[in-house]
Amino acid sequence: MENVVVGVESTAHTLSFGLVEMNGRAHPSKSSLFRPEEGGIHPREAADHHSEVAAGLLSSLVNEYKLNSNNISAIAFSQGPGLGPCLRVGATVARAMSIDWQVPLVGVNHCVAHIEIGRSQTGCIDPVLLYVSGGNTQVIARAGDRYQVIGETLDIGIGNMLDKFARMQGIPFPGGPKIELLAKEWKDNNPNANLEEISLPYSVQGMDLNFSGILNAAQTRINEGNDLGAVCWSIQEHAFAACVEVAERALAHTGKKELLLGGGVACNERLRQMCEVMSEERECIAFWPEKKYCVDNGTMIAELGRRMIQSELSTEIKNSSINPSLRTDHTTIIWE
């Protein structure tokens, strides 16, 4: 294998190494997920986990693909946004790899990487992105040389909301997949269920969203004695409908005809179904990459690094500091 970009992802609970060939062919990542024994993600504990598993994961990637300084074109890493201690681990590893192999270093925007891996894997060209993850919920579209944030959460990300609700019920991290399962099982057994029976707040404010209200209301429903599966179904229906409504408004506003799903919550089959129905009604097309490329992964970092290197963009070591508060629209886009 020749001419590859290696990507290092470490923004939150996942440390991941992936690679993409310069011709655009992507390869699965080597990843390790930090799972806290209780509560949510503790940044320093997650960073300790990343430090402990980094050497083994990287060695596995190097050995499988026979990587060396002769076939690596660049090292890309998540420069932000994310949890500071976690970002520092990935940045430190990436700098060491760049220096050791004497290849360019490329600091990339984690949010933009979700867009570019989605574009490359699905073939969509100029989509509206519904970006739904633990720490982020944004509706994004390209405008000139930026990916513009058209709408976003005003409090917590939808993934964090689902994980917090799951934790309140004693469901371990990550809670989203379990909520999806409980919701599906309950709905299958109650096909005529009505949302009015388990109503929750609707969280759209113009083009923005918030999820703390729906979280508190869902817990109140549990305290009132409602079935957990029923509340899981309701919380998904309400939260996803809000996201899809904002995405639909963005499609109408921009005139674009492609909707792309990205982020860990984009793995949810019910959300995909709702996006597909809405897109068909608008005569648009909904896209999403394979689930392994929706969750945080090193391959998406490598893909954005590849596009940047091909555009002659790289990062000097002295400019490679992490930026935990980096926003999607802070990155200038000069590639197609």
Question: What feature does the model see in each segment?
Answer:
Residues M1-E2, G107-V128, L304:
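Conserved phosphate-binding catalytic cores of ATP/NTP-utilizing and phosphoryl-transfer enzymes
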Residues E2-P81, H110:
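N-terminal beta-alpha supersecondary unit
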Residues N3-G7, A74-A76, C86, P127-Y131, ...:
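Short glycine-aspartate micro-motif
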Residues N71-I117:
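Glycine-rich phosphate-binding loop and adjoining helix at the ATP-binding site
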Residues G107-V108, E276-I301, S314:
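Conserved phosphate-binding/catalytic loops in two-lobed NTP-binding clefts
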Residues G144-D188, N216, T220-N226:
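Glycine-rich phosphate-binding loop plus the immediately following alpha-helix
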Residues L181-L259, N268-V277, E281-R282, I309-E312, ...:
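A contiguous, well-structured pocket-lining segment that forms one wall/lid of small-molecule binding clefts
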